[in-house]
């Protein structure tokens, strides 16, 4: 065949099979944090830095970011971070141990004021902390991480069990609905089955059907679990 003809018009490959595609900036200190200080003159990741990250994600055909969280607070360090991400079309979320659009450093920096990161003994303060996070992000497109791990990304206290996690997630959903003014299922949410959290799932802990289940590796690159046929049928999928 010597000739090839293409009919005039616009052609696309359709939407990506995976809705949220992006990066997690983890283990960022000292290399990335020192570079940002040198290149941008800040001790945190500000919107000038993150705008470059958003551009990178978009060039890679992505649309999603878990920001750096060892030393920085994406939302609190620079309020323009979230706004710039939203304007550029990048969806923001928080890591596996940072529920309800709050960065862990926001708690760590005020630990004496807030008290223990323990839902059994300090529920009122923690619920208030969660509420402030949802209130802050309700007007931008974010994916809310739900669930809870222990302080500093460790396991929860020994008195934690599936019933406690169920109560935490149930209360988080109520907070999301109250602060956004719409049903909880209309706000995208993700539950990370990381380390002992997957053990809770294997023991029967379940989340509402609309929640995305994020299956994690074992920190050594070995996938611990793949979604089964039933989990793929869920609205949130896995």
How should each PLM-predicted stretch be described?
Residues 73, 87-109, 116, 121:
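Acidic/aromatic-lined carbohydrate-recognition and catalytic surfaces
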Residues 23, 61, 213:
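Conserved, mostly hydrophobic/aromatic
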Residues 2-7, 69-70, 76-79, 86-87, ...:
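Gly/Pro-rich turn-and-neighbor structural signature
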Residues 238:
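Conserved small/polar residues in nucleotide/adenosyl-binding loops
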Residues 34-37, 69, 77-78, 97, ...:
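Short, solvent-exposed loop/turn and secondary-structure capping segments
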Residues 59, 63, 98, 140-144:
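Metallocofactor- and cofactor-centric catalytic cores in central/energy metabolism, strongly enriched
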Residues 30-33, 39-88:
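A conserved hydrophobic secondary-structure block that centers on an alpha-helix together
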Residues 1-5, 14-17, 84-88, 92:
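Carbohydrate-recognition beta-sandwich/jelly-roll modules
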């Amino acid at each position: 065949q010597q000739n090839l003809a293409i009919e005039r018009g616009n052609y696309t490959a359709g939407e990506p099979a995976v809705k949220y595609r992006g990066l997690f900036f983890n283990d960022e200190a000292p290399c990335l944090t020192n570079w940002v200080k040198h290149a941008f003159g800040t001790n945190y990741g500000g919107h000038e830095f993150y705008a470059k990250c958003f551009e990178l994600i978009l060039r890679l055909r992505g649309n999603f970011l878990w920001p750096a969280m060892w030393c920085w607070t994406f939302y609190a360090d620079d309020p323009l971070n979230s706004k710039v991400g939203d304007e550029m079309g990048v969806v923001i979320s928080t890591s596996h141990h940072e529920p309800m659009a709050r960065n862990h450093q926001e708690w760590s920096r005020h630990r004496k004021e807030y008290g223990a990161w323990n839902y059994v003994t300090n529920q009122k303060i923690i619920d208030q902390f969660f509420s402030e996070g949802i209130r802050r992000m309700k007007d931008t497109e974010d994916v809310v991480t739900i669930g809870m791990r222990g302080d500093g990304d460790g396991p929860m206290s020994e008195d934690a069990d599936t019933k406690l996690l169920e109560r935490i997630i149930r209360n988080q959903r109520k907070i999301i609905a109250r602060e956004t003014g719409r049903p909880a299922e209309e706000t995208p949410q993700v539950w990370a089955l990381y380390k002992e959290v997957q053990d809770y799932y294997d023991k029967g802990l379940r989340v509402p059907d609309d929640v995305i289940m994020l299956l994690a590796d074992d920190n050594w690159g070995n996938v611990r679990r793949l979604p089964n046929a039933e989990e793929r049928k869920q609205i949130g999928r896995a």
